[in-house]
Amino acid sequence: MTDTQVFVALLLALVPAVLAYRLGTELYR
């Protein structure tokens, strides 16, 4: 795996996590 592939994989894993976190904070309020 190249550095670019690792970066893309991390980005793809991070985006849904951030969205889920923001949704969770909105529902918590």
From Swiss-Prot:
InterPro entries with a match to the protein in the record: PSI_PsaM, PSI_PsaM_sf
Subcellular location: Cellular thylakoid membrane
Membrane topology note: Single-pass membrane protein
A Pfam cross-reference name: PsaM
Residue runs in coiled coils: none
GO biological process: photosynthesis
Keywords: Membrane, Photosynthesis, Photosystem I, Thylakoid, Transmembrane, Transmembrane helix
Predominant location category: membrane
Family: Belongs to the PsaM family.
Protein name: Photosystem I reaction center subunit XII
Species name: Synechococcus sp. (strain ATCC 27144 / PCC 6301 / SAUG 1402/1) (Anacystis nidulans)
Encoding gene, per UniProt annotation: psaM
